[in-house]
Amino acid sequence: MALNLQDKQAIVAEVNEAAKGALSAVIADSRGVTVDKMTELRKAAREAGVSMRVVRNTLLRRAVEGTDFECLTDTFVGPTLIAFSNEHPGAAARLFKDFAKANDKFEIKGAAFEGKIQNVEFLATLPTYEEAIARLMGTMKEAAAGKLARTLAAYRDKLQEAA
């Protein structure tokens, strides 16, 4: 189906707005994946706060101009599925990585975060806000307990020397 100029401009504007508000983007090739599987992926994406869209490469190049995802333009070859993470930088990468494990024909082409091309594995392993806070609290708790143990041991040694 041929798109007229207004349709193309609307697509570019929509994708550009999505790109400006996104934390990260992941590019994939979904050739050969069944419609049922893609529907499942789209549903999972909505639940994870990820917006997905299949866009023509020429329109996508125009849409990402001036955004943090301009570095991905070299990966816009063949059918391109782009996903923007809106709530957590690793959400789209984690979603695509898990989907690619279950679907051999699904190929992840690249990912971008903070204006640089990133490894999908790196983005997928980024902790969520809650996970990062939990790790920090665990580290602080361990440090406090360790300091208490060292203080008690030093006090015990001091008492033994005095005796």
UniProtKB/Swiss-Prot annotation:
Part of the ribosomal stalk of the 50S ribosomal subunit. The N-terminus interacts with L11 and the large rRNA to form the base of the stalk. The C-terminus forms an elongated spine to which L12 dimers bind in a sequential fashion forming a multimeric L10(L12)X complex. Belongs to the universal ribosomal protein uL10 family. Keywords: Ribonucleoprotein, Ribosomal protein, RNA-binding, rRNA-binding. The gene is rplJ. Disulfide bonds: none annotated. One of its GO terms (molecular function) is structural constituent of ribosome. One of its GO terms (cellular component) is large ribosomal subunit. This is Large ribosomal subunit protein uL10. Signal peptide: none annotated.
